[in-house]
């Protein structure tokens, strides 16, 4: 029969030994906890650094459009997207327009919804992926805005806002500086002189010069854009074919000519002149005001009412001491400087009218109605232009309606500089 294994008696420890073991375990536990605490502290510090350096700055809101908020990460991503598709521009240049583009994309989205025109994120994502393009919130919004713009023009404006046909007029037109010149040119037109030649000789508006006076057959909205003046069009759409207008006064359109009246009162040094001056709309007006000044009329009152050069007007005609400019530069214009620094200019005397090319407001139109068509079909180019104009009007109206909801105030110059630098770095890293 097998012997029973003798059970060992548990080892007994003295009170002193037990106290020692307990202290040892406590030390081990403290060391362990301390180690864990150090690790946790390191993780917290690293995480806090990441939070402060990356997460928090990237996730702060920089632009608001109503309830829609756009953070710095979105701003940077949008800047990168536009930078990659507009390689001819630096990120600094694109950043000038970026806040408005972000707002515009959101307004297009909001404005399209009441028209029943929407595109889901999923559809945009699929479109981007099929084109091997990266997908992000920014790229989705950019692509959506582009697609919505096309659909709004095709499905809304092109159908409901812009007709297929409209009244159209073909006009020849030019603006001259004064009523007397207009009367002279009108006689030449009636006598059969070539209109294009007359434009080259007499026209003072940039629009007539650009098109040689021939604005073609178009609806009014197109001609409004080409002429940038209502006076000639009011006449043309109410006149018969073949009509030549009388001189039509226009006090708002600008022309590329004006006339100086200058009085050099003193020369403090060889390179300085003390000057009084007015810049006036026409030669006739300049002659009249010169006579009034020489008769003792008040310079301040005349400059305030008639001068069309801002420095002259703001200083009430007293332009003060002007220093001769360095070579290849001017203080005002070549014509102005040439007179005031000419040693032969007589002091204290008003000059004759000196023509110059600074723009002035006001002139007289002559219009010849070449052709008129009632409710004629629009050309494809005109209709496309009209659709784009109406779309621009629609977008401007959205800005007006939502002006109080648009907030750029959080997008500081420091944030923009930081965003540009970060975007440049990320683009460089991606390219490397």
Name what the model sees in each region.
Residues 75, 195-196, 299-300:
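Conserved hydrophobic/aromatic "anchor" residues
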Residues 213-227, 232, 317-325:
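N-terminal entry motif of extracellular EGF-like repeats
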Residues 5-36, 44-58, 83, 95, ...:
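PPIase-associated folding chaperone regions across multiple families
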Residues 132-138, 196, 205-213, 309-316:
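Secretory-pathway/luminal and periplasmic proteins that interact with or process carbohydrate-rich
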Residues 50-142:
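N-terminal targeting/tethering segments
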């Amino acid at each position: 029969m097998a012997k029973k294994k003798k059970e060992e008696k548990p080892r007994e420890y003295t009170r002193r030994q037990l106290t020692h073991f307990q202290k040892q375990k406590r030390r081990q536990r403290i060391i362990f906890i301390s180690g864990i605490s150090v690790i946790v502290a390191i993780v917290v510090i690293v995480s806090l650094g990441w939070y402060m350096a990356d997460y928090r700055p990237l996730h702060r809101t920089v632009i608001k459009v109503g309830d829609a908020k756009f953070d710095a990460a979105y701003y940077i991503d949008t800047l990168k997207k536009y930078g990659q598709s507009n390689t001819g521009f630096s990120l600094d240049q694109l950043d000038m327009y970026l806040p408005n583009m972000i707002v515009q994309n959101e307004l297009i989205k909001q404005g399209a919804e009441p028209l029943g025109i929407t595109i889901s994120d999923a559809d945009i994502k699929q479109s981007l992926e099929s084109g091997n393009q990266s997908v992000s919130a920014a790229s989705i919004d950019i692509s959506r805005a582009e697609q919505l713009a096309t659909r709004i023009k095709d499905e809304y404006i092109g159908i409901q806002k812009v007709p297929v046909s409209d009244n159209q007029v073909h006009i020849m037109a030019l603006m001259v500086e004064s009523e007397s010149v207009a009367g002279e040119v009108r006689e030449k037109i009636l006598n059969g002189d070539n209109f294009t030649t007359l434009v080259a000789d007499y026209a003072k508006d940039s629009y007539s010069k650009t098109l040689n006076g021939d604005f073609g057959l178009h609806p009014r909205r197109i001609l409004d854009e080409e002429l940038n003046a209502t006076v000639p069009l009011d006449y043309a759409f109410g006149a018969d074919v073949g009509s030549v207008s009388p001189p039509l006064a226009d006090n708002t359109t600008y022309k590329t000519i004006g006339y100086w009246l200058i009085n050099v009162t003193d020369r403090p040094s060889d390179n300085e002149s003390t000057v009084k001056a007015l810049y006036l709309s026409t030669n006739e007006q300049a002659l009249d005001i010169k006579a009034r000044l020489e008769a003792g009329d008040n310079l301040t009152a005349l400059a305030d009412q008639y001068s069309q050069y801002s420095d002259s007007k703001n200083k009430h005609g007293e332009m003060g001491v002007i220093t001769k400019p360095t070579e290849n530069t001017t203080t005002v214009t070549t014509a102005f400087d040439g007179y005031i620094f000419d040693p032969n200019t007589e002091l204290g005397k008003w000059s004759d009218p000196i023509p110059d090319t600074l723009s002035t407001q006001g002139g007289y139109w002559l219009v010849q109605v070449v052709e008129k068509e009632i409710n004629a079909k629009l050309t494809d180019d005109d209709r496309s232009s009209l659709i784009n104009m109406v779309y621009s009007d629609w977008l401007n109206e959205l800005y007006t309606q939502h002006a109080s909801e648009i907030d750029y105030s959080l997008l500081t110059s420091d944030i923009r500089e930081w965003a540009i630098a970060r975007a440049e770095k990320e683009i460089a890293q991606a390219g490397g």
